[in-house]
């Protein structure tokens, strides 16, 4: 037997025992049981032998009925007992867990009569706090609705879902159906199948809360079935059956072991007592558990059943009869009204016999379901209509006569037309009761049409900007490159004047006032101003890219060299110069260099003629945010400015001047070399003079035997070369020797002249720099 007497955990007045925790502590003593405990409840009809079963199975000491005296209620409220002793077929040597057994007051007792509130709350409490709920029933009760407590189980399942169904865990309860007085005529498997089917049917008919619509019975419960022989007529077999049942409570690791981890609430024992008390408080206070009378229950059940049948018939005929009519408003509305009226009429014919408030409540719910189902078809029709109307609007806008009808006028007329047709269709559905509220659809339609018109407006604007860009960008590039390739001191004034005039020419069609534009697509004044600003940004970026891409070091050197050569090589009338003296070359060199360097500073920094730096009047880039971003460093470690006017750095300017100086020096050298070539040319009369004056020497050579021998050798050599045609190789050898000699002489001469000229040039550059600084 149990080591301590049972206590009444919840009395018949529905009060929770306040000393429950002390009872648990007395049962376990000083042991720390942790999670190694289990809770079992028994549930069933009054006088069905629940307490007797618990006493035999768990060696508890619950009060039992003496059938020889009187059949009456014995267990009142919910009683709790502790045990570690389970009646089994074999002795278990290992330490057995602590088991707490709840004996629940029997249902359907005459003492409470029609008051079923407590038995339902007690059953719900047992499911909420137990790992295993033993449902005690007789074999002859199976197949009954009230007798085997199925009605009570349905209510408990429904309320259990509403209270505990949304918990995000995998906790389950084992429903252990103990079938008493099982004589074996009907197999246990057949009995279990019957009970399982009843439970599954009950579950599908439950009114499930939001979030649990798709839940299954097996998401919350596991089912087991055990048969016990008759206690009096088959006492030995009954005892043996109970022991076999006890094996499943103690033999861990076996397939039929009942205390599985997913059944445990994972709370320490003192936490479980608090949990149990809170559960009872919640169950006791929850209004959903103040259940209506049996008549209302029947009305709700039957009207729900009738409603579901009518709805199923409606759905079965819906798709087949509606599909061919989706494109025709008149036929579609007629068929929808017909189907809806047929469904409601069928419900009214059968459900109107029950309680009116329940009947009307379920009718309203059915009507809502019908409208919800129909709303999908209506939305589909309206969306299809919207697409058709939108296609018509786009076609009307694109095919308009642009000479007489503006984009804004065309869009406004089309919008008014499609809104009228759409609203007329929607009102048709509403008048026939197929559409309860059109506010949401109207708002969605308005938002949709505004969004689509915005897309149409954006496309029109993109096309306009594209046409402007197509003309503006190449014009700017051509004009700017032309002006920069032939620069003057006022080149930046010319560029800016051309810049403004090019922009103005390309958007003059949209100008309404000075600095005010209307791009004729229905935009506000601020939006038009923003577009104008974007066009200026485009123009400035084009100008910036063109200037900085064109004015590279090599290009600027080429421009300076061309200006130099225009003055150095040609006179004022454009004729080529013929140099006579070095002084003439040096004088032309100074004038040409000054002319070339006049635009050097102009090409290095973009400033107007009054020495004002050119600054864009719009942001050049989105990331532009002040001076912190104006200076950057390139891959070669050179610092640059992002400001538009800054074209060359000081280092780049030195590089340009160095390359320019080298190139013009070569030009000067070539000019001076032409004078030297002229001076070193030998006149023909010199050869005649040499022949007359050198006759005596010639005769002396002939008379000398050595000279004669040398002459013969040379003559023989000449003969052999001529005889065998070897003049080609000989000429090549001679030319190579002469060429090498000439190159060596030129290098020496150039070195001499360049050194002399660079000395003069350095002095002249210093004088030029000083003069420029004085002029500034």
From Swiss-Prot:
Changing residue 50 to A: Abolishes GTP binding. Its EC number is 3.6.5.-. GO terms for biological process: endoplasmic reticulum inheritance; endoplasmic reticulum membrane fusion; endoplasmic reticulum organization; membrane organization. Keywords: Endoplasmic reticulum, GTP-binding, Hydrolase, Membrane, Nucleotide-binding, Stress response, Transmembrane, Transmembrane helix. GTP binds at residues 44-51. InterPro entries: G_GB1_RHD3_dom (IPR030386), P-loop_NTPase (IPR027417), RHD3/Sey1 (IPR008803), Sey1/RHD3-like_3HB (IPR046758). Residues 1-681, 727-776 are cytoplasmic. One of its GO terms (cellular component) is cortical endoplasmic reticulum. The chain crosses the membrane at residues 682-702, 706-726. Residues 34-263 form the GB1/RHD3-type G domain. It is found in: Endoplasmic reticulum membrane. Residues 703-705 are lumenal. GO terms for molecular function: GTP binding; GTPase activity. Pfam families: RHD3_GTPase (PF05879), Sey1_3HB (PF20428). It comes from the Eukaryota. Induction: By salt stress. It is a multi-pass membrane protein. Cooperates with the reticulon proteins RTN1 and RTN2 and the tubule-shaping DP1 family protein YOP1 to generate and maintain the structure of the tubular endoplasmic reticulum network. Has GTPase activity, which is required for its function in ER organization. Interacts with RTN1 and YOP1; GTP binding is not required for these interactions. Present with 2265 molecules/cell in log phase SD medium. Belongs to the TRAFAC class dynamin-like GTPase superfamily. GB1/RHD3 GTPase family. RHD3 subfamily. This is Protein SEY1. It comes from Saccharomyces cerevisiae (strain ATCC 204508 / S288c). The lineage of its organism: Eukaryota, Fungi, Dikarya, Ascomycota, Saccharomycotina. The gene is SEY1.
């Amino acid at each position: 037997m149990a080591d301590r007497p049972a206590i009444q955990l919840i009395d018949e007045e529905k009060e929770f025992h306040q000393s429950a925790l002390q009872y648990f502590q007395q049962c376990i003593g000083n042991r720390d049981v942790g999670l190694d405990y289990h809770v079992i409840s028994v549930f069933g009809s009054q006088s069905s032998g629940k307490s007797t079963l618990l006493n035999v199975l768990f060696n508890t000491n619950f009060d039992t009925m003496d059938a020889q005296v009187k059949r009456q209620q014995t267990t009142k409220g919910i009683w709790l007992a502790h045990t570690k002793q389970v009646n089994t077929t074999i002795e278990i040597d290992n330490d057995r867990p602590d088991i707490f057994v709840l004996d629940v007051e029997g249902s359907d007792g005459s003492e409470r009569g029609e008051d079923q509130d407590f038995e339902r709350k007690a059953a719900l409490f047992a499911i909420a706090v137990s790992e295993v709920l033993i449902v005690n029933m007789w074999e002859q009760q199976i197949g009954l609705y009230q007798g085997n407590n199925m009605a009570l189980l349905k209510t408990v399942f429904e309320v259990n879902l509403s209270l505990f169904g949304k918990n995000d865990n995998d906790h389950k309860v084992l429903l252990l159906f103990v079938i008493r007085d099982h004589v074996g005529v009907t197999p246990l498997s057949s009995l279990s199948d019957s009970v399982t089917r009843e439970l599954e049917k009950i579950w599908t008919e439950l009114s499930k809360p939001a979030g649990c619509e798709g839940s299954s019975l097996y998401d919350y419960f596991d089912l087991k079935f055990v048969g016990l022989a008759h206690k009096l007529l088959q006492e030995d077999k009954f005892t043996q059956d109970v022991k076999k049942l006890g094996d499943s409570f103690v033999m861990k690791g076996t397939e039929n072991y009942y205390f599985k981890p997913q059944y445990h609430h994972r709370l320490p024992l003192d936490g479980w007592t608090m949990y149990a008390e809170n559960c009872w408080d919640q169950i006791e206070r929850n209004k959903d558990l103040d259940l209506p009378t049996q008549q209302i229950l029947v009305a709700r059940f039957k009207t729900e059943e009738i409603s579901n049948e009518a709805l199923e018939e409606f759905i079965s005929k819906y798709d087949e009869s509606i599909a061919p009519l989706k494109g025709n408003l008149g036929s579609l509305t007629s068929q929808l009204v017909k189907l809806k009226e047929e469904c409601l009429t069928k419900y009214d014919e059968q459900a109107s016999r029950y309680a009116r408030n329940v009947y009307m409540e379920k009718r309203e719910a059915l009507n809502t379901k019908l409208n919800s189902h129909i709303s999908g078809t209506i939305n589909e029709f309206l969306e299809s209509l919207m697409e058709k109307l939108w296609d018509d609007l786009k076609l009307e806008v694109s095919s308009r006569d642009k000479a007489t009808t503006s984009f804004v006028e065309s869009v406004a007329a089309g919008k008014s037309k499609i809104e009228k047709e759409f609203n007329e269709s929607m009102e048709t559905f509403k008048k026939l009761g197929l559409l309860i509220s059109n506010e949401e659809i109207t708002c969605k339609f308005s938002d949709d049409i505004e969004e689509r018109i915005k897309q149409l407006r954006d496309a029109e604007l993109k096309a306009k900007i594209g046409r402007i860009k197509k003309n503006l960008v190449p014009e700017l590039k051509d004009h700017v490159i032309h002006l920069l390739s032939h620069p003057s001191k006022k080149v930046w004034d010319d560029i800016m004047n051309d810049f403004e005039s090019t922009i103005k020419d390309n958007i003059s069609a949209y100008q309404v006032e000075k600095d005010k534009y209307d791009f004729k697509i229905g935009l506000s004044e601020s939006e038009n101003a923003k577009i104008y600003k974007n066009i200026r940004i485009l123009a400035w970026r084009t100008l910036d890219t063109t200037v900085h891409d064109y004015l590279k070091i090599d290009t600027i050197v080429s421009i300076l060299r061309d200006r130099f050569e225009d003055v150095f090589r040609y006179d004022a009338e454009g004729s080529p110069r013929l140099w006579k003296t070095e002084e003439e070359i040096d004088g032309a060199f100074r004038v040409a260099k000054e002319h070339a360097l006049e635009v050097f500073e102009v090409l290095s920094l973009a400033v107007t003629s009054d020495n004002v730096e050119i600054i864009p009047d719009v942001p050049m880039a989105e990331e532009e945010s002040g001076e912190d971003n104006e200076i950057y460093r390139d891959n070669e470690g050179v610092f640059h400015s992002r400001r538009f006017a800054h074209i060359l750095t000081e280092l780049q300017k030195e590089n340009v001047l160095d390359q320019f100086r080298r190139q013009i020096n070569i030009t000067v050298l070539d000019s001076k070399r032409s004078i030297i070539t002229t001076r070193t040319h030998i006149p023909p009369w010199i050869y005649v003079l040499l022949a007359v004056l050198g006759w005596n020497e010639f005769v002396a050579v002939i008379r000398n035997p050595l000279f004669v021998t040398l002459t013969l050798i040379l003559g023989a050599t000449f003969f052999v070369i001529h005889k065998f045609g070897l003049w080609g190789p000989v000429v090549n050898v001679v030319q190579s020797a002469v060429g090498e000699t000439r190159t060596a002489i030129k290098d020496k001469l150039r070195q001499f002249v360049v050194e002399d000229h660079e000395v003069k040039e350095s002095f002249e550059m210093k004088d030029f720099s000083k003069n420029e600084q004085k002029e500034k």
